[in-house]
Design a protein with these regions (language model features):
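Short helices/loops that flank or line small-molecule/ion binding pockets
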Residues: 156, 358-376, 483, 487-512, ...
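Hinge/lid segment of periplasmic solute-binding proteins
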Residues: 380-428, 519-535
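Short, solvent-exposed loop/beta-turn-alpha elements that line the ligand-binding surface or hinge
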Residues: 395-403, 457-476, 530-537
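Extracytoplasmic/periplasmic solute-binding protein
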Residues: 413-427, 434-479, 489-507
Length: 687
């Protein structure tokens, strides 16, 4: 078990609780510090529940199945004040899952807790039971919940011992039961979005006819209403003093009708998608269990967040802070930053989005100039070009990894200032007898996609001329292309006798493995075999482009993050199935997965089964199966073909798109379109 790492969050909080209606204010300043610790529990199975008192924290976990015949029984662990972990031996005689835990006694003499678990009865029906246990795992009492099992099937979100019985948070109400498992009442009804409780108090967040509210279960009254549903719809916990709210992936402090932002989960290294469960200790400490993946080798942590009193010494190990900025930061980037932060002892990355409108672009440019950010992110290479002069030379950024061939070759064209953690492939087809592809998108995407495939023929940059005959052919191709999403469905499109022009974006190997319908006949189709008789181009679309800002005082730390992005550990866990990784070993892992012909276990512990998927379109079946050796060889050969990075939009490309779209929308004639393109583009080329 790794040692707890403590770091100081330079964050603030106000005290008190006020009127009934609460609004969320992300600009309101807070004034009391918070500290956060993290405990590495990666050696435990995925956590399903937690509770704790002054002596121990109790954890419920559910092992991952590694064999179809393996029986999965819940596991219970205890962590003491010295972070020593002990597994308790509880008499689980049936397979099942623990959904919630609750501390019962927090006295210094004896620690007891309760757990609520679900299992299958002998007749195959679902059964629920509460076990009351001591600190060694000895079961003092079992309580059958047969009477309310149907109500619990909709979901169980929390358990709290109180006044000799229990509160159970279900999906549509909070139930009160006695010590024998008999239902006493529905304490409150409505959609339950969050639940928390200690012996000091119990509350829930609910959505009812009166709106979104925090409800005190002991006093049976609304504490306050919440105005902005968007900000509180994903509540994880509510400390029992009612002055703190953990919801919408942020911690808020409530005072006088306003909830002030204290910190976002990302600030302490957690992405909301990683959070498994949350609980509150009697002293108000929040525990958040987070895991960065679903496989056996995923990292797992418990984050411990505390309020620091005004006179307390909050000095801890302060981390080096890096700021990653961008106009719009992608989900992949946010997950990468959260995963990186979870494993770091000395470095913390925070993210700042400036927006993609004109004002946001200006603010981002000023932040670069003023040295306010260390790392720059963009989803698209062309958006990074304008900031190239602000970025460090990263020509050595790929020297330490075995990189897949198309990325290595394409990067020589992109320059030396960018790091790309993964990529997708785009395949362009002009109209031809074999070019039957299904196109996603409307006029603008059609023009955009085909123009990159054709523009080198249409425009003669050296002689500053436009080939109007090729331009006319391009316009005709685009005009005749079916707009699949607007006018037709997949079966009708595939049954059409008319050749279909299109562009396909290859995000993962499964995109190659289709058996599609042409007419009513099922035929093999893979995105790389059926080249059209016209031009054929492969281009790499980067999945995230990163750069180190020139002048950053933490260049070494920034480089470490970029090495992490392109390294084996991160890429093998996160690349598939969203995109092709740049790391060769990570790519090989994908080949092992998609070509499996029998159940097997990869060296990293991943269970692999032969892949097969069936999808029905209007009674027509599309089947995807595992790749055979020949298909796999074809894909590898296709990936080794010469590739170029998806280019920056040049001004003349935008002009052509603009005029062609006007023609497609019947705003002008074909002859006028050819004339306008010729004139406008010639002026740009002359400049």
């Amino acid at each position: 078990m790794k040692k707890i790492i403590i770091f100081l969050l330079s964050l603030f909080v106000l005290t008190g609780c006020g009127r009934k209606e609460v609004t969320f204010d992300t600009t309101k300043e807070v004034t009391t510090a918070y500290t956060s610790e993290k405990l590495d529990v990666s050696d435990l199975p995925p956590i399903t529940g937690m509770c704790g008192d002054e002596q121990y924290v109790y954890i419920a976990a559910s092992p991952l199945r590694t064999d179809e015949k393996q029986k999965i029984y819940p596991e219970i662990y205890r962590i003491d004040k010295n972070n020593e972990v002990k597994q308790l031996s509880l008499p689980f005689e049936k397979e099942g899952t623990v959904y919630a835990l609750s501390n019962i006694s927090s006295s210094n003499e004896k620690s007891t807790f309760a757990l609520l678990w679900r299992y299958q009865d002998q007749d195959g029906t679902a059964a629920y039971q509460i076990m009351i246990c001591d600190e060694e795992g000895n079961v003092d009492q079992t309580i059958s919940l047969q009477e309310i099992s149907e109500e619990l099937e909709a979901g169980v979100f929390g358990l709290q011992a109180f006044d000799g019985g229990f509160y159970i948070a279900g999906a549509n109400s909070v139930l009160s039961i006695d010590q024998n498992g008999k239902k006493k009442e529905d304490v409150c009804q409505g959609m339950i979005l969050g639940f928390t409780g200690t012996e000091n108090g119990i509350a829930c967040l609910r959505l009812s006819e009166s709106g979104m509210s925090v409800y005190d279960l002991n006093e049976k009254k609304i504490i306050y209403l919440l105005e902005d549903r968007e900000e509180n719809g994903d509540m994880r916990a509510l400390p029992s003093d009612h002055t703190l709210l953990l919801c919408a992936n942020k911690l808020w402090h409530v005072e006088n009708g306003t909830a002030a932002l204290v910190f976002a989960l990302g600030d302490i290294g957690i992405n909301s998608e990683m959070v498994q469960t949350v609980c509150e200790l009697p002293d108000g400490t929040l525990l958040l269990a987070a895991r960065d993946g679903l496989d056996m080798n995923a990292n797992q942590w418990i984050y411990i967040c505390r309020v620091a009193g005004k006179n307390e010494n909050t000095e801890g190990l302060k981390k080096t802070e890096l700021v990653l900025g961008g106009g719009s930061i992608s989900r992949e980037c946010k997950l990468a930053v959260a995963a990186y932060n979870m494993q770091q002892d000395k470095v913390q990355i925070t993210m700042k989005e400036y927006g993609t409108d004109e004002a946001g672009v200006k603010q981002l440019s000023m932040a670069l100039t003023d040295g306010e950010i260390d790392l720059l992110f963009s989803s698209y290479l062309q958006d990074m070009e304008q900031y190239q002069g602000s970025l460090e030379d990263l020509s050595g950024g790929y020297e330490n990894i075995a990189m897949t061939k198309p990325v290595r070759e394409a990067l020589t064209e992109a320059g030396s200032r960018y790091v790309i953690p993964g990529f997708r492939m785009r395949t362009f087809y002009k109209r031809g007898d074999n070019g039957k592809l299904y196109l996603y998108g409307g006029k603008e995407e059609v023009c955009d996609s085909f123009l990159y495939a054709d523009v080198k023929g249409i425009l003669d940059e050296e002689n500053k001329k436009v080939d109007t005959n090729l331009l006319k052919e391009y316009i005709k191709t685009v005009e005749e292309m079916p707009e699949a999403e607007e006018n037709t469905s997949l079966p009708e499109l595939l049954k059409s006798d008319k050749p279909i022009c299109g562009v396909t974006e290859i995000s993962e190997p499964n995109d190659y493995m289709g058996i599609y319908l042409m007419g009513e006949q099922a035929v093999d189709y893979t995105g790389f075999e059926q080249k059209s008789s016209g031009q054929y181009v492969n281009e790499i679309v980067p999945v995230g482009v990163y750069g180190i800002v020139h002048g950053s005082k933490q260049e070494e730390e920034c480089a470490d993050f970029l090495y992490y992005l392109t390294g084996e550990e991160y890429q093998m866990k996160n690349a598939y199935p969203d995109y092709f990784p740049v790391n060769e070993k990570a790519q090989q892992r994908i080949w092992d997965i998609v070509s499996a012909t029998k159940e097997t276990t990869l060296p990293d512990g991943t269970q692999v089964n032969p892949y097969r998927c069936e999808v029905t379109y209007n009674d027509y079946e599309v089947v995807v199966e595992a790749l055979d050796h020949e298909q796999l060889h074809s894909i590898k050969a296709w990936l080794d073909m010469p590739c170029v990075l998806y280019p920056q939009k040049k001004k003349y490309v935008e002009l052509i798109e603009e005029e062609v779209i006007k023609y497609l929308e019947k705003q002008q004639s074909l002859s006028d379109t050819l004339e306008y393109v010729d004139k406008r583009v010639s002026i740009v080329l002359a400049e």
